[in-house]
Swiss-Prot record:
Alphabetical keyword list: Cytoplasm, Elongation factor, GTP-binding, Hydrolase, Magnesium, Metal-binding, Nucleotide-binding, Protein biosynthesis
Residues annotated as binding GTP: 24-31, 101-105, 163-166
Transmembrane spans: none
Region (G2): 80-84
Reactions performed catalytically: GTP + H2O = GDP + phosphate + H(+)
Protein name: Elongation factor 1-alpha
Subcellular location(s) of the protein: Cytoplasm
Residue span of region G1: 24-31
Segments of this protein annotated with the region G4: 163-166
GO CC terms in record: cytoplasm
InterPro entries, alphabetized: EFTu-like_2 (IPR004161), EFTU-type (IPR029459), G_TR_CS (IPR031157), GTP-eEF1A_C (IPR054696), P-loop_NTPase (IPR027417), T_Tr_GTP-bd_dom (IPR000795), TRAFAC_GTPase_members (IPR050100), Transl_B-barrel_sf (IPR009000)
Length: 444
């Protein structure tokens, strides 16, 4: 039986590739919109979808059918139907777009940081429904938090889908109100709202997703798929040394150890001699696969499964980084970073010990020193050695990981040089690494 979400078609793999993060507050319609995008682009199994639709009808929940595509897919994944299927994708005219970290995940914000460090662009879904919109961008709203995050993670390409237009009877006034409020927030974050497309959509009904809707005669901009089609794939840093943060490790009968992750920089080829750090285990690349197809070489942006000889599954874990033996990824003893405090109920001082999420790693850390506080607008220091920093502050700090972890300077390897600090179930700060003090690594 085919998976509910179809694998990439041969045409897709010929197209430039973009990783898209879908963000927004819970219940604003992210899953439904993703399901709708996959359906409209021919990436949903027709027979499977008919079953889902019938089931939704019987239960009187017709509006849930598109969201249930993702639920069905998650079930397939949990039953171990596919390994590579953590990523789903669809095609536009010019691009193949992979959706990273499907919405609705419990650790979505954390994964946004780890996952969005892999995103080239973001789709922000905001509901026009009264109450839902106000909650989403309010002080405690996830919508607001997600926008802060994608900004901190350096994602420049953004489209805003104003969803559930059917619920507000396609009211232009409500759309303009939502657009104006979100624009204010984007401006505050340093985006230029005039350069960002807002599209009034209904994920349930399909308005303005693939085709222009007659329900919104007052809107004459592009459809959502047309906007996505304008996104530019980022330059892929093939000339840098190899860095591949590990997302998952499997042991496959007859094949040995397979590490799964995304190549962030450099090029990986079959036959390469590689090292995984912090554990400092060395092995040889037997083969590389993406979406069930063998690759001779993997480049930045490729999500791959790498079959490695000489390394056991027990030796490596999510958060380790694969590199080549002639340029070993940096295991760090201490870092100096610029952070922005996104949320904290009181104040942060030296000795504060949150958890750092960096690329695919999660590690307890301690802020050992507050070096200076900066003016957020100019980046100039306004206070040396402040006693504390609070929400909204930008500061340069010294951080000590309490366990071995790979971290690089943001200027050398951006995806391994940006991180989030979490505590109390919330994202406290996001940052970029300015300096790294390397730890000694003995290759085994």
């Amino acid at each position: 039986m085919p998976s509910i979400i179809l694998p990439p078609k041969p045409t897709a793999l010929q197209k430039p590739h973009i990783n898209l993060a879908v963000v927004g507050h819970v219940d604003n319609g992210k899953s439904t919109l993703v399901g709708r995008l996959l359906y409209e682009t021919g990436y949903v199994d027709e027979k499977g979808f008919k079953e889902i639709e019938e089931m939704a009808k019987k239960m009187g929940k017709e509006d849930f059918a598109f969201a249930w595509i993702l639920d069905r897919f998650k079930e397939e994944r949990e039953r171990g139907v596919t390994i590579e299927a953590t990523h789903v994708g669809f095609e536009t005219n010019k691009l193949f777009i992979t959706i990273i970290d499907l919405p609705g995940h419990r650790d979505f914000v954390k994964n946004m940081i780890v996952g969005a460090s892999q995103a080239d662009a973001a789709l922000f879904v905001i509901s026009a429904r009264p109450g839902e919109f106000e909650t989403a961008i309010g002080p405690q709203g996830q919508g607001r938090e997600h926008l802060f995050l994608i900004r901190t993670l350096g994602i420049q390409q953004l489209v805003v889908a104003v969803n559930k237009m059917d619920v507000v009877n396609y009211d232009q006034k409500r759309y303009e109100q939502v657009k104006s409020e979100v624009s204010k927030l984007l401006k505050l974050l340093g985006y230029d709202p005039s350069k960002i497309h807002f599209v009034p959509v209904s994920a349930v009904k399909g308005d303005n997703v693939r085709t222009k809707s007659s329900n919104t005669p007052w809107y004459n901009g592009p459809t959502l798929l047309e906007v996505l089609d304008t996104f530019q794939p980022p330059p892929r840093p093939t000339d840098k040394p190899l860095r591949l943060p590990i997302q998952d490790v499997f042991s496959i009968t007859g094949a040995g150890t397979v590490v799964v992750g995304r190549v962030e920089t450099g090029v990986l080829k079959a036959g390469d001699r590689v090292v995984v750090v912090p554990p400092a285990k060395v092995g040889d690349v037997r083969s590389i696969e993406t979406h069930h197809m063998k690759l001779e070489q993997a480049q930045p942006g490729d999500n791959v499964g790498v079959n490695v000889r000489g390394i056991n599954k027990e030796d490596v874990k999510r958060g380790d980084v694969l590199g080549k033996v002639d340029n070993i990824p940096t295991v760090t003893e201490e870092i100096i970073a610029r952070i922005v405090v996104l949320w904290h109920p009181t104040a942060i001082g030296p000795g504060y010990a949150p958890v750092m999420h960096i690329h695919t790693a999660t590690v307890p850390v301690q802020i050992t020193e507050l070096i200076s506080k900066l003016d957020p607008r100019t980046g100039q220091a306004v206070e040396q050695k402040p006693q504390f920093i609070k929400q909204g502050d930008v500061a340069i700090v010294k951080i000590k990981p309490l366990k071995p972890v790979v971290a690089e300077k943001f200027s050398d390897f951006p995806p391994l040089g940006r991180f989030a600090l979490r505590d109390m179930g919330r994202t406290i700060a996001a940052g970029q690494i300015l300096e790294v003090k390397p730890a000694q690594v003995q290759i085994k």
